[in-house]
Amino acid sequence: MLRQYTTGSYGPHEEGPGIAEIRTHLPDDEASSRMALLASGFADPGRIRLLSALAGGAVCVGDLALALSVSQSSVSHQLRLLRSVGIVSSERRGRHIYYSLAWPGAAKVLGDLQGAIEGSERWQDPAMAGDNIQEEE
């Protein structure tokens, strides 16, 4: 039985074969939640820069802080978040902990994001993208 939201034959807002086709492309609720959690790791300009720094290989917190011109505590906080969502991993080497990308797809996501902003005028001006991006001081 078809549930109709408006009158007519399979028009807008009516359950029909087109809706079933759309649903085949939808992830289930659990997958959607996991995908959103993973995407949250990329949802901060500072984390994007941090992940970009790690794309070159394992780096310790102190070196990341110096390279990014931010405090070690800020870097550590962001790394904990990224580790909790599974994007980065850590390894102790003597007195230092080195971080690296745990998910190989992270470098591809960063590259795709970079390609998207370089290939579209929409993303050249943050105001055009509907977002106010501010640099951390």
Which positions does each model-derived feature cover?
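Functionally engaged cysteine thiol sites
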Residues: 60-62, 85, 121
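Recognition helix of helix-turn-helix DNA-binding domains
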Residues: 73-80, 92
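Alpha-helical residues within the helix-turn-helix
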Residues: 66, 77, 83-84
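Beta-hairpin "wing" of winged helix-turn-helix
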Residues: 83-93, 100
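Amphipathic alpha-helical dimerization/coiled-coil segments
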Residues: 1-34, 103-137
